[in-house]
UniProtKB/Swiss-Prot annotation:
The keyword Disulfide bond applies. GO terms for molecular function: receptor ligand activity. N- and O-glycosylated. O-fucosylated within the EMI domain (at Ser-63, Thr-67 and Thr-115) by FUT10/POFUT3 and FUT11/POFUT4. Keywords: Angiogenesis, Coiled coil, Disulfide bond, Extracellular matrix, Glycoprotein, Secreted, Signal. It comes from Homo sapiens. This is Multimerin-2. Residues 54-132 form the EMI domain.
Length: 949
């Protein structure tokens, strides 16, 4: 817009003024034509040295309005298609009808102005190559569409995320541009209003001069008035107006250069803005702002175009008026000269009078000529004064125009700097939008990652909860085993080992006493008879042999103990392997159970889908059809069952062998009988020996006594430790064998109960009911779990007969078993082991049974899913002092639970039966005292639906 405005004001205005002066005279403005080189475009100035004629070409902007079709939006519509009937069935009922969504484009008629640059002859030049100079030629008017600005295809669009500050700056810049445009229009109007006075004054002066010259025309018969006046006018114009127009042309040239540079920069900015617009997505508010801005720009463009058209019309009218005045003046002068010549040359009747008085007419000729020359001089002086006055006025006008042009140059520079700032701001906004897009993409990826992490955390949370539940069950089993072990240790009788050790010590003391008596008797016999020495020597040898025999027997006992220990370790390993095998078997059973449950759910879901697709009638027809054969033949099933039975028999034989080995080990683990005490013989003969032999014998006896004591201590320690570990291992092995044998018996009974009548099943040739099989296996597994937990719970809690609704004492875990046996659709059982003293609702957080998902452990209440009669039981272990609580039914009925124990605490249990509506809640509140914190807490809450109402 700025480029078109400045170009439309600068180019045609300068060329129009120069053309008007050039048409006034063909010879007087030659220096002006030579001085117009600085106002030509750069390309024209470069070709001046090569082709002198090329400088006569000038560029003219040409505009062309074109109409085009542009895609504005798309519309959706449905396409209906129908499958034709097959051949031979014209009235088929099952016709396949399809609908498909399609899109069609919607076009809009738009108009667009295409601007191009056309080269034409400069004002004052004609010809095919613009080589002829014609001062009378009327300059070709510029195309009326020059002031049109190429309309945008749409409103100005910015990238999303444009800041409000940038919008305010754009509005401020728009207001500044409108203000500058208004000033420029006022200046142009003022200049246009002052120019007609100058043009009107000049023809008036010329007309006055010509009229006075016509009065003296008959004085110069050989010279026309035009030849007399034109040199003077030419000289006057060259002297007074050439410097002014030269400086004016230089100013216009500099202004044109500045406008060209500014137009190039504005075009570059426009292209950059266009690229930003092409890569941006318009928003509603920015579209509205762009539409307003474009409307104002179009309005200003139209005003500038109208102003330019008015200026051109005025210049053209002035030029036409001047040309017509000069033509009329020339015609009038020619007419008068012709009349004068005719008057001088016409013959008359008074020719003699004229000839008679030539001297008398010739005498006043110098005086009249002198008077006429004086009059002409005065007229020229007045014309000079008038011209000087007009020149001063024109000088003032030109100074005003120069100041206006200077101000316009400053404003253009300011606009140029503002356009640079605007471009920088647009670039900054573009970078910010790109950063925002990158941040938005990163934020979206981070959101996706966080969602994935949250899902993973939920899965990990469920896995940890499941593992905690398994660890809790394992801990309960370990605590039960520990209690059983402590009970066994208390019942263990270790007095037999101590008696054996006392017997060994008595034997050692007897041996020592016998040695002392032998030494005394030897002393006595030595004095009495020397022959008794040989008998004593024999007795010592016998004692040595007995001691060696004791040592050998101790070594054999230690070897037997180590061998027994290794056998017990091997048995322990075998028991561990059997336990692992049993765990794997239980794991496989669980997997089969889950597979059966998944298959059952899939079958129910498929049945629902088939019912929705084909209808209940089609499903009933399909169910009434004869069932197809099984994928496996009954012979294969029979062979598989026989293999399973043989495997169970082999496993039973293996368990019998293992029991026999354990029995043998128990018999072998009994402590050996103590060796009989050997008395030395006193019947041997006596022999004499030296004193040195007796001293050596005494030392050997002392060392033998020490060795016997050491062996006794070692045997005592090893026998005690080995017996304790052996008893513990044997007890654990007995328990493991008993549990495994019972599990095998239960599996065998279950197997025979399920597949005992497989011959009848083969003869019936019907499919197995997987749902019934799954239900049977579930019930057997639950009974097995109840049987496994019964011994441990029997050791801890004992059931008491309920005389009243309110009783005291622990409650066994028979409630869950009763629920499993009854097959109630709604049942729950939960416990609370953390302990609390807050007077609020107790949240039983450990849930063992929750059939129907009606109990919410996070809130601690049960919500009835159906209307019916429910049975509830709550057992609370209160802390020291009195404790009180209440079982709340729907907020309107309360059943108290209290205890008055003053000791270390007591347990209170309450049973209640109530009819609940659907959605009513039941919970337990602590109103006084505290609840004891225990790992195996007796604080529990349970209930189930007895029947619906």
């Amino acid at each position: 817009m700025i480029l078109s405005l400045l170009f439309s004001l600068g180019g045609p205005l300068g060329w129009g003024l120069l053309g008007a002066w050039a048409q006034a005279s063909s010879t007087s403005l030659s220096d002006l034509q030579s001085s117009r080189t600085p106002g030509v475009w750069k390309a024209e100035a470069e070709d001046t040295g090569k082709d002198p004629v090329g400088r006569n070409w000038c560029p003219y902007p040409m505009s062309k309005l074109v109409t085009l079709l542009a895609l504005c939006k798309t519309e959706k519509f449905l396409i209906h298609s129908q499958q034709p009937c097959p051949q031979g069935a014209p009235d088929c009922q099952k016709v396949k009808v399809m609908y498909r969504m399609a899109h069609k484009p919607v076009y809009q008629v738009k108009q667009k102005v295409l601007t191009s640059l056309a080269w034409r002859c400069c004002p004052g030049y004609t010809g095919p190559n613009c080589e002829h100079h014609d001062s009378m030629a009327i300059p070709e008017p510029a195309d009326p569409g020059d002031s049109h600005q190429e309309p945008q295809d749409g409103p100005v669009s910015f990238k999303p995320g444009h800041l409000a500050a940038v919008i305010n700056e754009v509005e401020v810049q728009q207001e500044q541009q409108e203000h500058l445009l208004g000033d420029l229009q006022n200046d142009v109007h003022r200049v246009a209003d002052s120019l007609p006075g100058l043009w009107k004054a000049l023809p008036g002066n010329l007309t006055a001069a010509v009229m006075e010259a016509n009065q003296t025309g008959h004085e110069f018969p050989d010279r026309s008035l035009e030849q007399v006046l034109l040199p003077h006018v030419d000289t006057f114009l060259q002297v007074h107006f050439s410097p002014i127009w030269r400086s004016f042309n230089q100013s216009l040239h500099s202004l044109t250069q500045a406008i060209r540079n500014l137009s190039l920069d504005v075009e570059a900015n426009r292209q950059a803005i266009s690229r930003v617009q092409d890569s941006a997505v318009a928003r509603a508010d920015f579209q509205e702002l762009g539409a307003k801005f474009e409307a104002k720009v179009q309005e200003n463009t139209q005003r500038v175009g109208q102003l330019r058209q008015d200026v051109e019309d005025r210049l053209h009218a002035q030029h036409f008026t001047l040309h017509r005045s000069i033509s009329e003046l020339q015609a009038d002068v020619d007419t008068k000269l012709k009349r004068l010549h005719k008057a001088q040359e016409a013959p008359g009747t008074n020719g003699s009078l004229v000839l008679a008085t030539p001297g008398a007419g010739a005498r006043p000729e110098p005086d009249s000529l002198q008077a006429r020359l004086g009059q002409l001089q005065r007229n020229l002086s007045e014309l000079h004064m008038t011209t000087a006055r007009r020149e001063e006025e024109l000088q003032y006008t030109l100074e005003d125009m120069r100041a206006t042009l200077t101000r316009h140059v400053d404003e253009i520079k300011e606009l140029y700097s503002e356009s640079d700032e605007t471009f920088d701001q647009i670039s900054k906004v573009e970078r910010q939008v790109e950063e925002l897009q990158v941040n938005h993409t990163a934020l979206r990826e981070l959101r996706v990652i966080l969602m994935e992490k949250s899902l993973i955390m939920e899965e990990n949370k469920e896995e940890v909860e499941r593992q905690l539940l398994e660890l809790n069950l394992t801990l309960q089993h370990l605590q039960g085993g520990h209690a059983d072990l402590i009970k066994y240790v208390k019942d263990c009788n270790c007095q037999k080992l101590y008696l054996d050790l006392d017997v060994i010590r008595e034997g050692q003391r007897d041996a020592t006493r016998a040695l002392e008596e032998t030494q005394v008797s030897l002393d006595e016999r030595r004095q009495l008879d020397g022959s008794s020495l040989q008998a004593l020597q024999n007795a010592v040898d016998a004692v040595s042999l007995a001691v060696d025999a004791h040592k050998a027997e101790g070594e054999r006992a230690r070897a037997a103990t180590s061998r027994l220990r290794s056998q017990v370790q091997a048995l322990d390993d075998e028991v561990g392997a059997l336990k692992a095998a049993a765990a794997e078997a239980r794991h496989e059973v669980r997997q089969l159970h889950s597979a059966f449950a998944a298959l059952l759910e899939d079958a129910l879901r498929h049945e629902a889908v088939l019912a929705a697709l084909f209808g209940e009638e089609v499903l009933e027809e399909m169910s009434e059809q004869t069932p197809g054969p099984l994928p496996l033949s009954y012979e294969q099933i029979r062979v598989a069952l026989q293999d399973a039975a043989s495997g169970l028999q082999e496993q039973a034989l293996g368990w019998d062998e293992l029991a026999a080995r354990v029995t043998a080990l128990e018999q072998a683990s009994e402590p050996p009988r103590p060796a009989e005490h050997l008395e030395p013989s006193h019947d041997a003969g006596r022999e004499e020996a030296a004193t040195t032999a007796l001293a050596g014998l005494a030392r050997e006896l002392q060392s033998l006594s020490n060795d016997v004591k050491n062996v006794g201590r070692c045997c005592e320690a090893e026998a005690g430790a080995g017996a304790a570990s052996l008893n513990a291992s044997l007890h654990g092995l007995h328990n493991a064998l008993f549990a495994t044998q019972r599990s095998l018996e239960q599996h065998q009974r279950l197997f025979h109960s399920l597949f005992g009548n497989f011959q009848g099943l083969m003869e019936a040739n019907v499919s197995l009911d997987l749902g019934k099989l799954q239900t049977m296996l579930s019930r057997k597994g639950k009974k097995q779990q109840k049987d496994l937990e019964a011994p441990r719970k029997r050791d801890k809690k004992e059931a008491e007969p309920l005389v009243d609704i309110r009783v005291t004492g622990p409650v066994p875990g028979a409630l869950g078993a009763a629920l499993w046996e009854a097959g109630s659709p709604v049942a729950f059982y939960a416990s609370f082991s953390e302990g609390t003293a807050a007077l609020q609702t107790v949240k039983f957080n450990t849930t063992y049974i929750n059939i129907g998902s009606s109990y919410f452990p996070e809130h601690g209440y049960f919500r009835a899913p159906e209307r019916g009669v429910y049975l509830f039981a709550v057992s609370v272990e209160f802390g020291p002092g009195p404790g009180t609580g209440q079982l709340v039914f729907g907020g309107h009925h309360r059943t108290p639970v209290c205890t008055t124990g003053q000791g270390s605490g007591s347990t209170a249990t309450v049973f209640a039966m109530a009819e609940l509506q659907k959605g009513e809640r039941v919970w337990f509140e602590l109103t006084q005292g505290s609840i004891t914190k225990r790992s195996l807490s007796g604080t529990a809450f349970g209930g189930f639906l007895m029947f619906k109402t």
